[in-house]
From Swiss-Prot:
One of its GO terms (molecular function) is calcium channel regulator activity. Residues 22-76 form the Kazal-like domain. GO terms for cellular component: extracellular region. Vasodilator protein that inhibits vasoconstriction of isolated rat femoral artery induced by phenylephrine. Since platelet aggregation and vasoconstriction are key hemostatic responses, particularly in small wounds, this protein likely participates in the antihemostatic responses during blood feeding. Blocks L-type calcium channels (Cav1/CACNA1) in left ventricular myocytes isolated from rat hearts. It comes from Tabanus yao (Horsefly). GO terms for biological process: vasodilation. It comes from the Eukaryota. Expressed by the salivary gland. Gene3D superfamilies: 3.30.60.30. It is found in: Secreted. Keywords: Calcium channel impairing toxin, Disulfide bond, Ion channel impairing toxin, Secreted, Signal, Toxin, Vasoactive, Vasodilator, Voltage-gated calcium channel impairing toxin. This is Vasotab-TY2.
């Protein structure tokens, strides 16, 4: 009985870590730049991402420093 309970707990722990990591880690090498602006609105800190996937990946991995898409193309 203890072994079964332990096994269930381990499986739940593994499932939690696997489900929590939904961030895209591999993006294509296509260069279709997008300009992002910090979610706080500081336009002087705009940043060009290689593509939409790069911006999405950054936002997923950096919850406290996210960017909103400002426009397609490089930031000027």
């Amino acid at each position: 009985m203890k072994f079964a309970l332990f096994s269930v707990l381990v499986l739940m722990l593994i499932a939690t870590f696997v489900a929590a990591d939904d961030c895209p880690r591999i993006c294509t090498a296509d260069y279709t730049p997008v300009c992002g602006t910090p979610s706080g609105g500081r336009r002087s800190a705009n940043r060009t991402f290689a593509n939409q996937c790069g911006l999405d990946s950054h936002n997923c991995l950096n919850k406290g420093a996210t960017y909103d898409k400002l426009h397609d193309g490089e930031c000027k």
